[in-house]
A protein has these predicted regions:
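Short, acidic/polar
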Residues: 17-24, 85-89, 114-116, 176-178
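Histidine/acidic-residue-rich catalytic or RNA/ligand-binding cores of hydrolases
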Residues: 142-149, 169-178
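Metallo-beta-lactamase
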Residues: 5-14, 145-152, 160-163
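Active-site metal-binding loops of divalent metal-dependent hydrolases
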Residues: 4, 40-41, 78-79, 135, ...
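An N-terminally biased module of ancient metal coordination in phosphate/nucleic-acid-related enzymes
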Residues: 1-70
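Short acidic/histidine-rich active-site segments
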Residues: 186-189
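Non-catalytic positions within long, well-ordered alpha-helices that form the structural scaffold/packing
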Residues: 28, 124, 181-182
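Extended substrate/RNA-proximal surfaces in nucleic-acid metabolism proteins
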Residues: 47-159
Length: 189
């Protein structure tokens, strides 16, 4: 699982350790063997340091081992759109995916950000690989799906939600993710 919110009390995901263990066990029961914890990082809202998230991740991994739930956890962040994205990574506030060059980011859900191309260029020019979280769910990409293709042509990889495929996020998201799948534009689920 490339995108999850399993760390307790960090963002809008799990509320406590018991819920985190339950969520991970459910993922294991449907076949997952590895989960990347991608807690939100949003300036002035969700600002838990990489060191603190790593400590929570280690605590959760220990809890899983105690309960004999064999599944590997990795650290990452889902970084909210900001022109400071590179400095957040370099200052160890936000995390790349498991210390790699992959950077998971998200846009505002209901507004098209300005300077998208400059934002993507800043990630690429710092030698990172941008990965856009759930492109099928943004209002502006639902209105202008060609933006997804433009971003892909710029070098952005796409991470879609399984829930979009089954209609959990509405018909528009489902139609867009189906077209993305047809065009090999879903790189991670």
């Amino acid at each position: 699982d490339f995108h999850s919110h399993i760390l307790p009390g960090i963002d809008d995901g799990s509320r406590n350790l018991e819920q985190s263990i339950y969520m991970v066990n459910e993922a294991k029961n449907v076949g997952f063997t590895k989960i990347i914890s991608t807690s939100h990082y949003m300036e002035n809202y969700y600002e838990v340091s990489q060191a603190d998230r790593k400590a929570w991740l280690n605590g959760l991994q220990y809890g899983l081992e105690e309960k004999k739930i064999g599944l590997s956890l990795y650290l990452g962040s889902e970084i909210y759109f900001t022109d400071k994205i590179i400095s957040l990574i370099k200052e160890a506030k936000a995390s790349t995916i498991n210390g790699s060059r992959y950077v998971l980011f998200e846009f505002p859900m209901n507004a098209k950000p300005i300077n998208i191309e400059d934002f993507v260029y800043s990630i690429l020019s710092a030698n990172y690989i941008p990965v856009l979280a759930h492109p099928e769910r943004y209002t502006f990409t639902q209105e202008e799906p060609e933006i997804i293709y433009q971003l892909a042509n710029q070098g952005v990889l796409m991470q879609s939600n399984y829930g979009s495929i089954i209609g959990q996020y509405g018909k528009k998201a489902q139609v867009i993710v189906e077209k993305m799948l047809e065009n090999n534009l879903v790189h991670f689920l």
